[in-house]
Swiss-Prot record:
Name of the coding gene: SLC19A3
Protein name: Thiamine transporter 2
Segments on the Extracellular side according to the record's topology features: 29-53, 103-110, 166-169, 304-316, 364-375, 427-434
Reactions catalysed, as given in the entry: thiamine(out) + H(+)(in) = thiamine(in) + H(+)(out); pyridoxine(out) + n H(+)(out) = pyridoxine(in) + n H(+)(in)
InterPro entries, sorted: Folate_carrier (IPR002666), MFS_trans_sf (IPR036259), ThTr-2 (IPR028337)
Entry function: Mediates high affinity thiamine uptake, probably via a proton anti-port mechanism. Has no folate transport activity. Mediates H(+)-dependent pyridoxine transport.
Domain of life where this protein originates: Eukaryota
Record organism: Homo sapiens (Human)
High-level lineage: Eukaryota, Metazoa, Chordata, Craniata, Vertebrata
Amino acid sequence: MDCYRTSLSSSWIYPTVILCLFGFFSMMRPSEPFLIPYLSGPDKNLTSAEITNEIFPVWTYSYLVLLLPVFVLTDYVRYKPVIILQGISFIITWLLLLFGQGVKTMQVVEFFYGMVTAAEVAYYAYIYSVVSPEHYQRVSGYCRSVTLAAYTAGSVLAQLLVSLANMSYFYLNVISLASVSVAFLFSLFLPMPKKSMFFHAKPSREIKKSSSVNPVLEETHEGEAPGCEEQKPTSEILSTSGKLNKGQLNSLKPSNVTVDVFVQWFQDLKECYSSKRLFYWSLWWAFATAGFNQVLNYVQILWDYKAPSQDSSIYNGAVEAIATFGGAVAAFAVGYVKVNWDLLGELALVVFSVVNAGSLFLMHYTANIWACYAGYLIFKSSYMLLITIAVFQIAVNLNVERYALVFGINTFIALVIQTIMTVIVVDQRGLNLPVSIQFLVYGSYFAVIAGIFLMRSMYITYSTKSQKDVQSPAPSENPDVSHPEEESNIIMSTKL
């Protein structure tokens, strides 16, 4: 029996199933679409101003403060302890949400929820430490799909219970507490990884290429962004550099290894962001994600402002379910659309940023709750479609380690931007704007993003046309020779 359990645990199926079960129950939270009616209702008796200006900003600030330390800690302790910590934070969040009272307690709730969101990196990174590379794509798809399915199922369940069974919002939170508690139990059964991406990367793998050749200096393959060639994790580089063997690596002090890892991170990020293509897609990712998170934080308050939950039937659960499902379908469809994203990608950023701005303006100006719901559906679906394209454009030429770094830094920059918006627009120490005016600001924000990338798209189109005119009289030129004027146009040469 022990042999069977050991062989099962060592395969990729067992950790994938356990992780997916954790992901499902941690995201199956039917109380989520009805959080604002619960907080402003008789259970908590909080005002809209208290929720908007005093409670919700705490999540943004705590997420920003915790993200980078948790990102480093996740790799250092090899993922599982941070996943368990996330499960504990989930339970504390919902216990306080159920039985706590007052603004201060709800601010503590937001702090622990910031811990939950900061620890999400462990859920997505864990699988790369226990699954062989040939299963990465499949398993990553499972993990992401199950969270979308769980969120959709939770939203549908919530709407059915509220509309048909007239269930109290309090009991929706009881169901959420039970669900996240089950997720915590599943986290205890995850196998402990023997390696991680950076601090505990295995140094004993065979190196196919000669260690005397620096991969950064090798000729870039056609279609790869300069400086973003696939590179080995730090500890593997140390062990294969000809200066340190495995025994010497093990004898290094942990502080030295930590410094080496941070130095390698800095070098990797510097090389990756030197690619203009990756830089501009990352720029859109950071700015758009900041705006998207801000809208998600406060959209329920806007709905409650347009149609108060005490006076009318609300359909937040149905809207969230449709929006999530529609976004997932749009993101899935991207893989089957034959488009040269290198040529039209930034134009797509312009078009959909305009769509996002228009949907937010609609949500601000309309007095009809159904039009407000429709604007949100359009906004969320278009963002999920574009973020899928952006992730692919960024990750296509990066290995897992470099993608994790770029993802972490992009998320951190998005949080910095979101924090600045929160301080200026939302916080009581800033402008303290009412929620309806906030959405006018967010719509203007996406309009500015569209304007920036419109100018960038026009510049690329003009540069490409000029370059073709220059190259056409000289067809005998060596196509492998890089021209100085092509540097700003490097995205045109990428193969998908």
